[in-house]
């Protein structure tokens, strides 16, 4: 459906370049992203991308590569994906795709909350900043030390960029730490919309979440509905 309707998948490089030069974008650009680094990317997604002439972005939890096999990719498989020329390997934290104790019985996202220590003390903002920075640096180091390009995109685990948090000030600080390392950060949004020049300037790009319950037709309709008005006319035949 997407190819027939004139959509073209783009790379990290094209997305980043479009901030200064929108003319690098095709008429109907979109980006296909996958989170976590599950082995299904190699087994199922890559053959389909090859078949349809699309490319993908793998947001990888580097601390889980080569673990719990066969669920997560190995480093060899991740490298093989990169070498196809169809994939960009990007960051989804090192060990930060977890929920942490943040007070009472709450378990909340690692990146935007202060951890409650076993003695009941909440970590300080400085401790939390150091924790987030160390995780971000380790994710980058893991990818580059395995011969992969330095990541330039980051997808928030759970799409938790500002909520739920036990310290809004720290959530803002955490975003700044990530933005110092990655030119663009990504989150899922409930209402599909096209990424705007304002989003790219702000460094926070919206995504449409796709689950196993999402049909091809439903996804296509959501993408088309998010298009700027002049582009909403062309649709492929129903199937």
Which residue ranges define each predicted feature?
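Membrane-embedded segments
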Residues: 14, 27-29, 33, 41-45
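Solvent-exposed loop/turn segments at secondary-structure junctions
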Residues: 16-17, 36-40, 63-67, 94-99, ...
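Metal-dependent polysaccharide deacetylase catalytic core of the NodB/CE4 family, i.e.
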Residues: 26-30, 50-162, 205
